[in-house]
Amino acid sequence: MPQAIPAGGALGGSTNRALDGRRLGLALGMLVLPQYVALGAPSVALPAIGRALAVPFGATAWILAAWSLTSALAMPVAGRLMARRSPVRVLVAGVVALAAGSALAGTGPTLPVVIVGRLIGGAGAGATVIAVFAVAGALPGRERIRALGIIAAAGATASACGTLVGGAVTAWLGWRAVLAIPVLALPLLPAALTDRRTFTETGERNDSSGRLDLVGAAALSVLAGSLITLLQAHSVGLPAPVTLAIAAAGALAAVGLWWRMRRLPDGFVPRRVIAARGFLPAGLVGGTIFAGYYGVLFLAPSLIEQVTGGGALEAGALLVPAAACSVPAGRLVGALTDRFASWQVSAGLAAFTVVGVLVVAAFHGPIPVVAGTALAVCGFAGAQAVLVGLAPELVAARDRDTAQGLLSFMIFLGGGIGPAAVAGLSTIAPERVGLAVLAAIPLAGLALSLTRPPITH
């Protein structure tokens, strides 16, 4: 009989009532809506941003990649902080940074200032997401899958429907208003914090008096940042000496991180977490799926505009059917985890993403672009509902917050790799060719699912 993905562990501490996964999922899903809109909405506005700021279209990929990069980097940091502090503090700090960075991005006079704002906002988004998923992931039994499915559906719908929102806002208010959309998370925060006790019942805490491994955090940050930068080095015209220096910094960071893990097993990247059975496959498979999805999200609106001759509003409206697929996908994948083995579910999600990327790359016309985007949306929504929530099942209770942060880092980093790779390849080959090459990434995730499946204890 195939092994189903088990449900999450029970919440720590005593409680006089059973937490409702649907109610909690709705509250948290509403909170993450603005930041997920911030993923899809700017993709439609990128052509307008490039024209307004007088930069090449490929350079605007940084607007998506910067957000995904710092979002991914903030997740393990937030995970370690939640092992020492209340998730409420992490959540509030994340939402404040999200709003402040988005306000800066929306008012930035040049692309570098806009990117700085997106970097700050992305870090806030990452902290918010890890706090949200930590709370939902600690629910017991089917309530966990239910809450994660609702959050995944909300995130996928918002990020893909963000193209419609972005198109409408770009057409009526301008691209700056699009980048400022995440500021709307601030008024939603009080509603999510109505039941503060929920955010304190996320299981055991460890090392509450320990110090954060800043060296390990810095090494991981430099490694991830150098990877994203190198992928886009050609598209932004970085000189060869600068590119080599970034590559050297990335290599040194990789060596330093490896040395730090051996010297400090309980550091920022604990060896016992990385070595946990199924942890690396889950993170890598999820990252490849996210890379494929965000690569499609970066290019699809531009391709539709080229084919139809319309503007941002038309492109966003045409992508709405693809967004609608996220709702049934998130719920269906959650139900399938009871019937199929984890490797079957993850392989199916990767396969959907591969096919979606290739359909968008190979076929012309708005219908194939929408159909391919819909397939990629299904993979994205399913990965959030299943793979992102696996951390509590892969490690000991005391490592859950740390593992959640690192696993989310690996998965969400793919969101930065996807558009960066497409933008970098588009400078040496046609855009569709670059997107077709990107399909190799989720294809590798499919192969990994079949050979080293992400399983739980």
Residue ranges and their predicted role:
Residues 20-101, 132-133, 172-173, 177-183, ...:
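12-transmembrane solute porter fold
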Residues 149-162, 410-418:
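Glycine-rich segments within core transmembrane alpha-helices of 12-TM secondary carriers
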Residues 140-141, 197, 396:
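Helix-capping/helix-break motifs at membrane-protein junctions
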Residues 103-107, 190-195, 255-258, 358-362, ...:
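Membrane-embedded alpha-helical segments of multi-pass transporters/permeases
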Residues 119-154:
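Cytoplasmic helix-loop-helix junction between adjacent transmembrane helices
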Residues 171-284:
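Hydrophobic transmembrane-helix bundles of small-molecule transporters
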Residues 1-20, 202-206, 451-457:
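Intrinsic disorder in cytosolic terminal tails and internal cytosolic loops
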Residues 91, 144-154, 209-218, 274-275, ...:
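Cytoplasmic-side transmembrane-helix entry/capping segments in multi-pass membrane proteins
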